[in-house]
Design a protein with these regions (language model features):
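Small-polar-interrupted transmembrane alpha-helices in polytopic inner-membrane proteins
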Residues: 97-114, 164-170
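Individual transmembrane alpha-helix segments
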Residues: 52-88
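Cytoplasmic juxtamembrane regions at transmembrane-helix boundaries
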Residues: 78-107
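N-terminal signal-anchor transmembrane alpha helix
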Residues: 3-32
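Membrane-proximal helix-loop-helix units in multi-pass membrane proteins
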Residues: 103-143
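Terminal transmembrane helical module of multi-pass membrane proteins
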Residues: 142-215
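Extracytosolic (periplasmic/ER-lumenal) interhelical loops and adjacent juxtamembrane/interface segments
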Residues: 33-64
Length: 215
């Protein structure tokens, strides 16, 4: 397997791993049951039980928090490896470089969130959230500016839509605005677009590599 395909595989694995951890760890909750509408993703990694968050108090008790934090660390590693291994395939220029670096910063956010659960070090965890929320979504918007790239250049529309969706999710989540899916649901709208984007990019890297080999 060449470098590009290995990097694409890392990106294609990161999203199902993270989503599976969200589902499985959430199903382990008993008192209270986990709610995607009410609870934050971070609540799955909290190491203590009790009422959490003074701005939006909610009961939290995650028996499998170690599994969630381990999955976040693995997601961070896969996202970072995806960036580094597919670096040449994503194109040249300031926009392509900026998109790579911003995505790498988001990967660092996942690593920091895993190392500093919200109830252990709230300040560091908030910094991790900002790296994911702000820089991750900004990276997709910057990627929408990439022109001459068989990978990013061919998905400018998807980058723009997903980046804009993520930014809207961030603003609504931070403003604690519920548009029908709960404030916790809005956090998913802020976080999941980047994960979907990496799947799309990974798939395009694989197709671009196959096209090169056949030409």
């Amino acid at each position: 397997m060449d470098r590009d395909r290995l990097g694409a595989a890392c990106w294609l694995l990161a999203t199902p791993l993270f989503l599976a951890a969200n589902v499985v760890v959430g199903l382990a909750w008993r008192q209270p049951p986990f709610s995607w509408a009410t609870h934050n993703i971070s609540d799955l990694g909290n190491v203590t039980c009790g009422v959490w968050d003074s701005t939006r108090p909610r009961p939290v008790c995650s028996p499998w928090h170690d599994a969630m934090n381990g999955a976040m660390a693995a997601t961070a590693a896969l996202l970072a490896l995806g960036v580094l291994l597919t670096w040449p395939a994503l194109g040249r220029g300031l926009a392509a470089t900026g998109a790579r670096l911003l995505t790498l910063a988001a990967a660092a956010g996942y690593a920091l969130a895993a190392a500093a659960p919200a109830d252990v070090d709230e300040n560091r965890h908030f910094l991790a959230a900002l790296l994911i929320f702000v820089l991750g979504n900004l990276g997709m918007l910057v990627a929408a500016l990439v022109g001459r790239s068989p990978v990013l250049g061919g998905m400018r529309g998807a980058s723009l839509v997903l980046g804009s969706t993520g930014v809207a999710g961030v603003l609504l989540f931070l403003g604690q605005v519920d548009v029908g899916v709960g404030v916790g649901g809005m956090e998913r709208v802020a976080v999941f677009p980047l994960l979907l984007w990496t799947v799309l990019v990974g798939a395009r890297v694989v197709r671009a590599g196959r096209a090169r080999r056949l030409s």
